[in-house]
Design a protein with these regions (language model features):
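Fe(II)/2-oxoglutarate oxygenase catalytic core
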Residues: 1-178, 186-207
């Protein structure tokens, strides 16, 4: 499905004991072409948005919060095809920066990623803080654990709706940026309330 094996021996590799959690959050700036960002925003507005849902792995159920829930929709095959090589490029950059290249048997962090889900934040909407233990990715045929989280940002003409980690570590993403971080319990994150405009983004998880 995907190939993240474009590894290079990078002297700036950060897989070292002194690396902090914050150091492992990486942004590829402007990696998505502006015209593709504009096309995605226009294309998604032609289709139905639905309230975001949370998956309960114990009860095997989905549900939305009563207020402030963002809007979501799945990618079409056509948009997925356009975004796939860009996601692979971003993932390869992360791989190169953080993989322990001296390992004889395992030099690749991930092999596949999910279909992109599009997110829309209108004024008053948020993403509640959570961690990316995405049980619903795996149905028995695909086996693994989510390893890396990706957020793709498609516009910057909005206020608020900023990605944050922990209490107040905030990332202001530009148009065409992709931000990545490990999908585990050490990275609680959410999105602040949108104030004006609409923020359009996409998410995918690699394993």
């Amino acid at each position: 499905m995907t190939n993240f094996s474009d590894l290079t021996n990078n002297n700036n590799n950060l897989n070292v004991p002194s690396t902090t959690l914050l150091n492992t959050i990486h942004v590829e700036r402007g990696i998505i072409p502006a015209n593709l960002c504009d096309f995605i925003v226009q294309d998604t507005e032609k289709r139905e948005w639905k309230p975001h849902t949370w998956y309960n792995s114990v009860q095997d159920t989905y549900g939305s919060e009563e207020t402030k829930e963002l809007d979501v929709q799945p990618s079409t095959p056509e948009l997925q095809q356009l975004l796939t090589p860009i996601i692979i490029q971003a993932g390869a950059a992360y791989n190169s920066k953080y993989t322990w290249l001296k390992s004889e048997r395992t030099q690749q962090i991930m092999n596949k990623f999910t279909g992109v889900r599009f997110n829309r934040y209108q004024p008053g909407q948020i993403m509640r803080q959570h961690i990316d233990h995405i049980h619903s990715i795996f149905d028995g045929k695909e086996k693994g654990i989510p390893v890396l989280s990706f957020i793709l940002n498609f516009n910057d003409d909005y206020e608020g709706a900023d990605l944050f980690f922990w209490d107040n570590t905030t990332f202001k993403l530009g148009k065409g940026d992709i931000i990545m971080w490990p999908s585990n319990f050490l990275y609680p994150h959410g999105v602040t309330e949108a104030i004006s405009g609409k923020r359009y983004s996409g998410v995918t998880w690699a394993w």
